Amino acid sequence: MMNQNVQGQGNVIKETTNKVFIVGALVKNGLEVINEGEENEAIRGSLTLRTEDGSEHDVQYYANRYKKSNGSFTNELNPQFDTLLAAKEDFIDMSNEYGEPATVIKIGGGSFRANDYMSKNTGALVSTFRINASFANKLEGKDLELNPQLAKYEVSGIITKIEPEMKNIRI
């Protein structure tokens, strides 16, 4: 993402670069097909990839079956849905029962995203980051040799304002 302004709690951050590149062996395939209302089928979930250094990276995906236009679904199929459906059905993870080697995957369109939510246990705001991506491509043959299994993150931005955190203040 280029030059996106992100605002939150008094801070303004100008995001200038947000790119994630990962090539790794599939540890866990957590993609699932779901029905969202009567109109839409979607695929969501994650692929967990392990790079050569042993680190694991959880990559989140979501795609509707049909494209949207002006907030409504069209009859046009979303190619991202088909790509992820093929990944769900065809990619082999490390826990497969046949002992086959895990599929090596290269993610496409990856980026960091804020993941903020209220904790059900404490009621406190939890702020984390997660990796979202658009595509997952299976690497085979010569592509395996040309793409080392590693994770590369390119994230930069400009913080224009920081305010002190105020917690549990009673007025």
Description of each model-found segment:
Residues 1-171:
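OB-fold and OB-like single-stranded nucleic-acid-recognition modules
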